[in-house]
Amino acid sequence: MSGKGVDIEHWSRIAAEWTAWARAPNHDAFWAYRASLLAFIGQGAGEALDVGCGEGRVSRLLKDCGYRVTAVDPVSQLISAAERAGSADAYMIAAAADLPFKNCSFDLAVAYNVLMDVEDIPAALKEVRRVLRPSGTFVISIVHPFADRGHFAGTEANAPFVLQRSYFGRERFEGTEVRNGLQMDFAGWSQPLESYMTALESAQLVVTSLREPVPDTSDKASYMERWSRVPLFLWLKARLLPI
């Protein structure tokens, strides 16, 4: 996770909770999208930066893709958890908006479901641009802004998706989920797609690929079936615009 102030405080408080939640196989949405995410990133080589690595599961995926991975997160407890699991090749405690690396250090940067926890997204994206090499790629996953503002009207797989409040504006969200004996307290920022695109424009990053992935529900919990009708995530690839 990555951010400052309220975001670091939140993730520091629930670091152990998140580590248990994220590492339970097939427990949350990540597992239903993992194969598609691996294919979207693609096999590669060189230096990869996992921005807001959390407990390290995306770092481990990047290693599976063939990269040498540097994992960063502003929450020391999460960096420790990632390191204990051997998730990456190098680890640093750092926020997305203040990366301790030289210019043009990485071939790939990934921010997986991190930008919702960043208070200053434009500053974070400008930092990522700075540390990417000119030929580098930036992979972003966010909770789909549309999914963020609505909810399903019931628990059944075909329950209608309802949007009752405005899609626009920036809002703080907080909520608790309990599943299979595990509890997770989520918090972050909800904002429309335009906010992310404006931040990319200001960082002079151009989107080259966009996906609204569909979950693999073949062996996952039935609660994921509904997300085959409404996109839960939005994935982007961005490249540097020449200055």
Language-model features: where?
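A short glycine-rich, Lys/Arg-flanked "PGG" loop and its adjoining helix->strand segment in the class I
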Residues: 122-137
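Short alpha-helix
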Residues: 187-210
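Class I SAM-dependent methyltransferase SAM/SAH-binding core
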Residues: 49-51, 55-98
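A short SAM/SAH-binding and catalytic strip from SAM-dependent methyltransferases
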Residues: 108-121
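Acceptor-substrate binding/catalytic loop of class I
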Residues: 142, 146-149, 181-194
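A short acidic, Gly/Pro-enriched loop at the edge of an enzyme's catalytic core
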Residues: 97-108
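Conserved class I S-adenosyl-L-methionine
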Residues: 1-44, 57-61, 78-81, 85, 137-176
